Amino acid sequence: MKVAVLGAAGGIGQALALLLKTQLPAGSKLSLYDIAPVTPGVAVDLSHIPTAVEVKGFAGEDPTAALEGADVVLISAGVARKPGMDRSDLFNINAGIVRNLVEKCAATCPKALIGIITNPVNTTVAIAAEVLKNAGVYDKNRLFGVTTLDVIRSETFVAEAKGLNVADVKVPVIGGHSGVTILPLLSQVEGVSFTDAEVAALTTRIQNAGTEVVEAKAGGGSATLSMGQAACRFGLSLVRGLQGEANVVECAYVDGGSEHAEFFAQPVVLGKNGVEEVLAYGEVSAFEANARDAMLDTLQADIQLGIDFVK
């Protein structure tokens, strides 16, 4: 099993690479790429950790060597948010980065499962899809927007609010991966009830959690460590699915035939072909239904922005 991380010298990329080095199955290969010249050194640093995961690092303009034979590609390359920016402000720089990297994936590892971490995810996933279509290798079951950070934040905040063991808390999150498009389905959390005020407050906190981190870091970065953990969880789930493990379910932003938008985050079953099944997200509360319907114009505009960028 070979996993490639593109953007591996950045804050998310280094955190993700560390976690994958310690958690990938024995015998796996971890391939790190970044434009930054430090990247081979990051690989050497990680190679001193005593796990049976082989690490190689590649730097420069061309990621081809890092991508050869990759089963999973996780893309975190791009610029990070600064105070006063929202995820859409990142578009002008990150759109081109994602386009160029996915073009290389299409040429080098067209069957790989691709997880897009680079923001704005609502738009960058649409860019990736158009690039893969243009290359004639698009498979909607092999492209994912990684929204796992919204899920782990939801689990953490619900557990804190209700005094629960966070390991027992499961919160599906649907929609997209920015602002109002992030919709935690708190009505589906088992064994706990919320007042209307709690639902509104928790939903808003989950939607704005990225900004909470950006502001707390006072210009020194965005959510890199928690995002690294979220991306590792999702990447390991992709690997487990590829290895044939049953009942691997994660929420992800996919082209899954949703009635709501071309791309929509919802629970999916992961397997040897990527998405094996898109699961219905089930019954929602009136609050959630209203929030879902209210987000759709924003989500569809984000998607169209990505389509138009490639055309």
Swiss-Prot record:
EC category: oxidoreductase
Recorded catalytic activity of this chain's protein: (S)-malate + NAD(+) = oxaloacetate + NADH + H(+)
GO molecular function, one term: L-malate dehydrogenase (NAD+) activity
Presence of the UniProt keyword Repressor in the record: no
Any GO BP annotation: malate metabolic process
Keywords carried by this UniProt record: NAD, Oxidoreductase, Tricarboxylic acid cycle
Pfam family, one: Ldh_1_N
Residue numbers binding substrate: 81, 87, 119, 153
Active site: 177
E.C. numbers: 1.1.1.37
PROSITE patterns, per database record: MDH
Binding residues for NAD(+): 7-13, 34, 94, 117-119, 227
Function: Catalyzes the reversible oxidation of malate to oxaloacetate.
Quaternary structure (record): Homodimer.
Name of the protein in its database record: Malate dehydrogenase
Gene that produces this protein: mdh
